[in-house]
Amino acid sequence: MCIRDSPNVTQNRLNSLIDLMKNETIDGQRVIDKPIFRDRLLSIQGRLMAQQSNALRILSSQINKEQDANLAKAIVKLQGTELRHELEGLAIDAMGELGTLYEDSPHLRDNGAWQMTYMYYLGLIIGGGTNQIQKNIISERALGMPKEPKIQGA
């Protein structure tokens, strides 16, 4: 698992998102007080807690040498990438029109870090099929599904 994807780093990013949502307003109301945004935030928070528990389970398996943790790592990697993309997307939505800014602007929040990180995780999800590869590994190793057939002549 990449340091950038660790549950602790994601927790720090979630805390920054909460601060952002407390400061941004839509129609004079704080974003964090709007139910649709708060529901999305709580969903992300719950998924992060599950990811933190899985990371501890992996660590415990490695320390106690109980079982191979490679499959659990693949699941955490897949979930972590999707979670971070969703977290960054919520921040962009919370900023409203300012969330669409990407480069130099006097209104840019956090020097565009939310937008850049959103695009980074989008790249991990679709670039080279990274998430699809993780899903294939999980389906083949955990569920015992057959491997994808190889195309002749490719």
Task: Annotate the PLM regions.
Residues 1:
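Sequence context surrounding c-type heme c attachment/ligation sites in exported
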Residues 4-154:
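Alpha-helical interface subdomain recognition
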